[in-house]
């Protein structure tokens, strides 16, 4: 592993928190992700399923976790099933976890090889009152490709069609949204690596560089800092491309007088960071660019004061929309008449700020969490307002990651990353 693994006490605690939400006599099942093939004998790098990782710390394919707190056999209240390693596998693929290593990573004492799964699982299902199965219930999930979890659910329903099924996803969304101090440490590390990348870019950008040159510089810094790379596909969008919210081609030349909108973040230990900065290609903002930049920064700073415990996310987004509306009027992008005649379902400000301000972040960049419950301590959110003006070939977004406190304003995990335009200009022209 490139990263420092967290102590198993975290995963023991996470399983305890999960178990507290289960019905009496319930059995829960979690599967690892597949290794996804591309063509011929090629495949994408393995990325572990966030839920089994959150509950076990095991970062290995072909793994299954069972949680059965009320089992009559105390050795079967937590079970990990792993692919059995061998000298041949070690030569071709590298060493896999043995049972002792699996315990050291997860705190799970009972570890079996995968070929024993069906026999043991059958005995546990018979004893259980219901079975919690795991599905991807993220509001923006792409569910076209069948996953290992999907195949398991199909198999389970065929074999155990008379058994009661429950959903693990609502529980996972709840417990994953509240971060442990150890998780926050990993997220801070990811943000610190992202800072290194950002400072490298401020010293690198000049007219004539390609967007992909910037992407390459970032990847260099991330890999050198023990990150596995980008937490998500980076956006390096110069000029008018900055008005395409998910522009990922990164293949244009950065021209004198343009602003580059960059949205990127390092991954560390499975945890994401998510940063947006907008910088002038030539190191100097024009007055108009400054005005738009400062409007976005004002909204971001004021939004951070609103992101507090007890508030509902929907209410928070309405309040931020009002902040943005005021700034767009000041910039003469919308008028009071536009506001008076606006469609309530799509306010006038959305012509220039059409996305949300904040999302959960953690093991996933767009992490799971419940919008139906109030903001709570140790949740982590982005704050990322933006203004996009295609007719001016200008798009500016500013984004940092924030940890909710017990009271008062959140803590900015990216507070050391330059954001004031004067500092950005100074660093680009030193």
Residue ranges of model-derived segments:
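Active-site neighborhoods and metal-handling regions in enzymes and metal-associated proteins
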Residues: 1-430
């Amino acid at each position: 592993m490139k990263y420092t693994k967290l102590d198993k006490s975290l995963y023991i605690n996470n399983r305890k928190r999960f178990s507290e939400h289960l019905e009496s006599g319930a059995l829960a099942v979690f599967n690892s992700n597949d290794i996804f093939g591309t063509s011929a004998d090629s495949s994408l790098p393995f990325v572990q399923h966030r839920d089994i990782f959150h509950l076990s710390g095991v970062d290995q394919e072909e793994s299954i976790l069972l949680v059965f707190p009320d089992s009559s056999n105390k050795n079967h209240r937590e079970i990990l099933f792993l692919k059995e390693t061998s000298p041949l596998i070690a030569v071709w693929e590298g060493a896999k976890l043995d049972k002792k290593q699996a315990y050291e990573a997860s705190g799970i004492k009972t570890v079996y090889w995968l070929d024993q799964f069906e026999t043991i699982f059958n005995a546990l299902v018979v004893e259980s009152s219901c079975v919690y199965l795991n599905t991807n219930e993220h509001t923006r999930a792409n569910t076209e490709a069948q996953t290992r979890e999907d195949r398991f659910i199909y198999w389970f329903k065929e074999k155990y069609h008379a058994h009661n099924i429950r959903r693990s996803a609502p529980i996972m969304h709840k417990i994953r949204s509240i971060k442990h101090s150890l998780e926050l440490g990993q997220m801070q590390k990811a943000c610190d690596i992202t800072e290194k990348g950002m400072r490298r870019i401020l010293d690198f950008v000049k007219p004539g560089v390609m967007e992909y040159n910037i992407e390459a510089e970032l990847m260099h810094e991330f890999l050198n800092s023990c990150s596995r790379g980008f937490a998500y596909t980076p956006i390096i969008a110069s000029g008018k491309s900055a008005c395409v919210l998910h522009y990922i081609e990164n293949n244009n030349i950065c021209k004198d007088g343009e602003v580059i909108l960059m949205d990127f973040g390092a991954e560390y230990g499975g945890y994401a960071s998510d940063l947006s900065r907008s910088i002038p290609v030539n190191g100097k903002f024009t007055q108009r660019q400054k005005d738009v930049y400062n409007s976005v920064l004002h909204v971001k700073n004021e939004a951070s004061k609103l992101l507090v415990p007890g508030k509902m996310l929907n209410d928070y987004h309405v309040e931020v929309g009002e902040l943005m509306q005021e700034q767009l009027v000041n910039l003469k992008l919308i008028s009071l008449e536009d506001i008076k005649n606006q469609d309530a379902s799509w306010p006038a400000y959305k012509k220039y700020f059409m996305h949300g301000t904040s999302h959960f972040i953690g093991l996933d960049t767009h992490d799971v969490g419940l919008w139906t419950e109030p903001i709570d301590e140790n949740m982590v959110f982005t704050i990322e307002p933006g203004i996009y003006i295609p007719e001016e070939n200008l798009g500016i977004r500013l984004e940092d990651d924030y940890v909710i406190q017990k009271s008062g304003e959140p803590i900015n995990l990216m507070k050391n990353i330059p954001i004031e335009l004067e500092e950005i200009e100074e660093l680009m022209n030193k």
